[in-house]
Amino acid sequence: MSDSSKTNQCCPTPCCPPKPCCPPKPCCLQKSPCCPKSPCCPPKSPCCTPKVCPCPTPCPCPATCPAACACPCPMKPCCPTKCTCCPKKCTCCPQPTCCVQPTCCSSENKTESDSDGSGQTQDRGAQTQQSPQGGQGNWNQKKTK
């Protein structure tokens, strides 16, 4: 009888941690409130120990970890090394799906760069303007000659 009492004291929380005194059966019964049915937290183990499902590292967080799962996606750098959707000047993006939506990064980038250093903004703007103007200039010169 003393064993039963110890088992109850060992598992006061709805989510039973993996302890020797905590059998997997009662823990499995209460896995619903502990871990909701979401792709973020697959039912690999019978007892879901982590209440908050860990959010994946990649940029498209909502695709892997939906709002149903209680894991907020942290603010990651808007333009990673492998991401070519946003300019390199982009510091961070309020939305986790920055790689999917380049406009999210552009609007944030202009405000951030303008405040941080106008010199960098002008330099980047000059490069952007030179590319299309240079292309048009070549076409005009070829047509003239």
Swiss-Prot record:
Which pairs of Cys residues are joined through disulfide bonds in the record? none
Membrane disposition: Peripheral membrane protein
Provide the free-text tissue specificity comment from this protein's UniProt record.
Testis. Selectively expressed in the spermatids of seminiferous tubules and in flagella of epididymal sperm.
Q: Which residues carry this modification: Phosphoserine?
A: S38, S45, S113, S131
What GO terms describe the biological role, i.e. biological process, of this protein?
binding of sperm to zona pellucida; flagellated sperm motility; penetration of zona pellucida
| Alphabetical keyword list | Cytoplasm, Fertilization, Membrane, Mitochondrion, Phosphoprotein
Top-level division of the source organism's lineage: Eukaryota
Localization recorded for this chain is: Cytoplasm; Mitochondrion membrane
Q: Which GO terms describe its cellular component?
A: cytoplasm; mitochondrial membrane; mitochondrion
Map out region (Disordered) in residue numbers.
Answer: 105-145
| Stretches with biased composition (Polar residues) | 116-145
Signal sequence, renumbered to the chain: none
Q: What the protein does?
A: Involved in sperm motility. Its absence is associated with genetic background dependent male infertility. Infertility may be due to reduced sperm motility in the female reproductive tract and inability to penetrate the oocyte zona pellucida.
This protein's name: Sperm mitochondrial-associated cysteine-rich protein
Organism whose genome encodes this protein = Rattus norvegicus
Whichever gene encodes this chain, its name is Smcp
